[in-house]
Amino acid sequence: MSLDLRARVREELERLKREGLYISPKVLEAPQEPVTRVEGREVVNLASNNYLGFANHPYLKEKARQYLEKWGAGSGAVRTIAGTFTYHVELEEALARFKGTESALVLQSGFTANQGVLGALLKEGDVVFSDELNHASIIDGLRLTKATRLVFRHADVAHLEELLKAHDTDGLKLIVTDGVFSMDGDIAPLDKIVPLAKKYKAVVYVDDAHGSGVLGEKGKGTVHHFGFHQDPDVVQVATLSKAWAGIGGYAAGARELKDLLINKARPFLFSTSHPPAVVGALLGALELIEKEPERVERLWENTRYFKRELARLGYDTLGSQTPITPVLFGEAPLAFEASRLLLEEGVFAVGIGFPTVPRGKARIRNIVTAAHTKEMLDKALEAYEKVGKRLGIIR
């Protein structure tokens, strides 16, 4: 690294530290479980996206081992050259069945799935209407297109309609929203958005990263939760790294959509395909949720209990509707201090501040899973009570 570049990088790092934005990730010293190990201590884990408890499940590990032994360590190529194997087709067929759509296409990253699908769908002359709290992958994906980009106030259907009225086009009108919003835990009002899209001849695009495996029958997602899963004008994109405990993303919808993405989605075209072990584990997760749908109900039982008890303690959880349960602290230093104190009490829950969330809205984001026991949640709640009183957040 040249001296000038080194100085530039150091200057930027110092700025991040001054502004309280510097990140130093915690290192987990045990598997991704509801109880794990951080900094040498056993902790209740409220920081992961392991919604259904699949990350270290014996069945998924066995499926991964089987596919590793049968198919080897890697795929060796991009999908369009020599990197599409029968196990990739098997996974896509399983995802389409699960989502209730004509087809599904697996992409190599959840983040770049949005870039790939949006880039393939949109061109100059199209207009996009995007919720202001959409995920960074949507924001970055839209920046790479030539479509006109308009932002509507969060979950504000009246504002969305104003924009639809004012911006007609002969091209595609695409309404883009998260299914479940990752910082607040609220659900997109698809029951209002989809009818509005029909009225103005628009297509709806849902990033269901935090809804898949959580909402709907057997965790089939936000779109299924609202009953729009067979609508050809609703495009679903989701990740394979959260509830399904793997890596990657996928798009589900009409067969023609899959064919278009195979030909035009750049992350699909230029990234090596999933290795066999990952696909084996993902297939195992989809098999398990069919056999054990009670996991989703257990997730919701735990979620309801944890939210109710936090409210009883006097915490503001920002009206969250899902297992994503933010606890509001306001200023980032306070949230980070609370996170540090919780860790001392044996609870791993991470503070989040600006720019991930607005200034004055710093919080600790908790995610309850199906694998947590009541005893684990009670330990976390006791820690929250102790820390909250120490910091003067609750009485």
Curated annotation (Swiss-Prot):
Its EC number is 2.3.1.29, 2.3.1.47. Keywords: Acyltransferase, Biotin biosynthesis, Pyridoxal phosphate, Transferase. InterPro entries: Aminotrans_II_pyridoxalP_BS, Aminotransferase_I/II_large, AON_synthase_class-II, AONS_Archaea/Firmicutes, AONS_Archaea/Proteobacteria, PyrdxlP-dep_Trfase, PyrdxlP-dep_Trfase_major, PyrdxlP-dep_Trfase_small. Pyridoxal 5'-phosphate binds at G110, F111, S182, D207, D208, A209, H210, T239, L240, S241, K242. Optimum pH is 6.0. Stable at pH 4.5-5.0, and a loss of less than 10% of the initial activity is observed after 1 hour of incubation at these pH. CDD domains: KBL_like. It catalyses: 6-carboxyhexanoyl-[ACP] + L-alanine + H(+) = (8S)-8-amino-7-oxononanoate + holo-[ACP] + CO2; glycine + acetyl-CoA = (2S)-2-amino-3-oxobutanoate + CoA. Pfam families: Aminotran_1_2. Catalyzes the decarboxylative condensation of pimeloyl-[acyl-carrier protein] and L-alanine to produce 8-amino-7-oxononanoate (AON), [acyl-carrier protein], and carbon dioxide. Can also use pimeloyl-CoA instead of pimeloyl-ACP as substrate. It also converts 2-amino-3-ketobutyrate and CoA to glycine and acetyl-CoA. Activity is also observed with the following combinations of substrates: acetyl-CoA and either L-alanine or L-serine, pimeloyl-CoA and either glycine or L-serine, and palmitoyl-CoA with L-alanine. NCBIfam families: bioF, gly_Cac_T_rel, PRK06939.1. Homodimer. This is 8-amino-7-oxononanoate synthase/2-amino-3-ketobutyrate coenzyme A ligase. It comes from Thermus thermophilus (strain ATCC 27634 / DSM 579 / HB8). The lineage of its organism: Bacteria, Thermotogati, Deinococcota, Deinococci, Thermales.
